[in-house]
């Protein structure tokens, strides 16, 4: 008989709904300043005193859109951006042509509160407490967002990794360059030349003016080569070609640049770049990068 009774108690317990209101933790400086971690499945307890206001603070940048309660006659709410101010208030009842004022009374003013912001939904139990010096009440309940903070930290770390990859210098694959210096042209001669199979890199130190670069075709005709200055190394001129022969010109000065290990196939830039683990993605106008 005892076993049957015990089994029945267990079944009743398992079948009963689980109510576990989350109680904010008080600050070590003042217990009336309270903090609670956000969880969309929690109902948070807010304890107030008659005649004393309180506020609920949501995430910075979050904006309150809607506030609802089961006892709006007995509570006053005022929303301002991410802060909700609340206070128990008196209510007036009419009976037999008489008006009766009822002051907030602990135990009779308890209700629920629902807040919707532009980012989340919140649920609360509002409880009016007795005792003017009750230390369990809240002057402020402030939410913390550990999951959002962790996600932001991961995103920031990923961004740093991507930025580091973007800032990585391409790996040189060919240093075998020679040059022919024209008369009085030494001032535009590069001190370093290499390529990564896709672009050619020339160094011009000491704040020298960069010459224009021209591609020399088999018939000796010349065509200008697009170029840019390396943002991370302002003394490097990046030519958007790898060629067997190029010419540098600045006024009457001329330098011949010869690629002694020219590979017509170059490096197959399948990802659109020659930087490892960096892929070039072309998006349509207005399309967000993921």
Curated annotation (Swiss-Prot):
Residues 1-20 form the signal peptide. InterPro entries: Conjugal_tfr_TrbG/VirB9/CagX, VirB9, VirB9/CagX/TrbG_C, VirB9/CagX/TrbG_C_sf. Keywords: Signal, Virulence. It comes from the Bacteria. Pfam families: CagX. NCBIfam families: VirB9. Belongs to the TrbG/VirB9 family. This is Type IV secretion system protein virB9. It comes from Brucella melitensis biotype 1 (strain ATCC 23456 / CCUG 17765 / NCTC 10094 / 16M).
């Amino acid at each position: 008989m005892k076993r049957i009774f015990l089994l029945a108690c267990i079944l009743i317990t398992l079948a009963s709904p689980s109510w576990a209101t989350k109680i904010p933790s008080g600050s070590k400086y003042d217990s009336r300043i309270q903090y609670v971690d956000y969880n969309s499945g929690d109902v948070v307890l807010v304890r107030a005193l008659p005649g004393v206001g309180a506020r609920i603070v949501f995430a910075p940048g979050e904006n309150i859109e809607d506030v609802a309660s089961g006892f709006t006659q007995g509570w006053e709410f005022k929303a301002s951006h991410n802060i909700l101010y609340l206070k128990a208030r008196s209510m007036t009842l009419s009976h037999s042509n008489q008006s009766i004022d009822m002051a907030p009374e602990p135990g009779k003013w308890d209700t629920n509160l629902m807040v919707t912001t532009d980012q989340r939904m919140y649920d609360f139990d509002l409880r009016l407490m007795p005792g003017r010096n009750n230390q369990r009440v809240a002057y402020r309940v402030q939410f913390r967002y550990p999951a959002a903070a962790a996600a932001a930290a991961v995103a920031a770390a990923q961004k740093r990794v991507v930025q580091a990859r973007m800032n990585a210098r391409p790996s040189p694959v060919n240093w075998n360059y020679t040059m022919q210096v024209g008369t009085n042209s030494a001032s535009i001669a590069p001190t370093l030349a290499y390529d990564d199979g896709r672009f050619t890199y020339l160094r011009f130190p000491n704040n020298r003016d960069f010459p224009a670069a021209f591609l020399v075709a088999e018939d000796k005709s010349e065509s200008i080569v697009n170029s840019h200055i390396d943002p991370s190394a302002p003394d490097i001129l990046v030519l958007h070609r790898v060629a067997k022969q190029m010419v540098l010109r600045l006024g009457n000065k001329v330098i011949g640049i010869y690629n002694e290990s020219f590979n017509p196939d170059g490096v197959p830039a399948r990802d659109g770049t020659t930087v490892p683990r960096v892929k070039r993605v072309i998006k349509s106008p207005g399309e967000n990068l993921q």
